[in-house]
């Protein structure tokens, strides 16, 4: 899904999308560049 893609690619746009998806927030944190790391 989009959050798996965000984690794999560390795409800022996808990280922003996942940031608004509570179930994905913790998965994205630490896997994406700042400010999502």
Curated annotation (Swiss-Prot):
It is found in: Secreted. Its main location: secreted. Disulfide bonds join 3-18, 10-32, 15-24. GO terms for molecular function: pheromone activity. Pfam families: E_raikovi_mat. GO terms for cellular component: extracellular region. Keywords: Disulfide bond, Pheromone, Secreted. Mating ciliate pheromones (or gamones) are diffusible extracellular communication signals that distinguish different intraspecific classes of cells commonly referred to as 'mating types'. They prepare the latter for conjugation by changing their cell surface properties. This is Mating pheromone Er-22. The lineage of its organism: Eukaryota, Sar, Alveolata, Ciliophora, Intramacronucleata.
